[in-house]
């Protein structure tokens, strides 16, 4: 599955993280 930075960021923010980005096609969230 492809990882889209915008979708990842929205998903992470919705879970209470400050941001997120794609690394090796996986969404990683940041505090």
Swiss-Prot record:
Main subcellular localisation: secreted
Stretches that traverse the bilayer: none
Cross-referenced InterPro entries: Scorpion_toxin-like_sf, Scorpion_toxinS_K_inh
Known tissue expression: Expressed by the venom gland.
Site (Crucial for toxin binding): 9, 11
Family: Belongs to the short scorpion toxin superfamily. Potassium channel inhibitor family. Alpha-KTx 19 subfamily.
Domain notes: Has the structural arrangement of an alpha-helix connected to a beta-sheet by disulfide bonds (CSalpha/beta).
Protein name per the record: Potassium channel toxin alpha-KTx 19.1
Classification via Pfam families: Toxin_2
Keywords: Calcium-activated potassium channel impairing toxin, Disulfide bond, Ion channel impairing toxin, Neurotoxin, Potassium channel impairing toxin, Secreted, Toxin
Record-level Gene Ontology MF annotations: ion channel inhibitor activity; potassium channel regulator activity; toxin activity
UniProt site positions, description: Basic residue of the functional dyad: 21
């Amino acid at each position: 599955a492809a990882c889209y930075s915008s979708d990842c960021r929205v998903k992470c923010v919705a879970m209470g993280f400050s941001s997120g980005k794609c690394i090796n096609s996986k969404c990683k969230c940041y505090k």
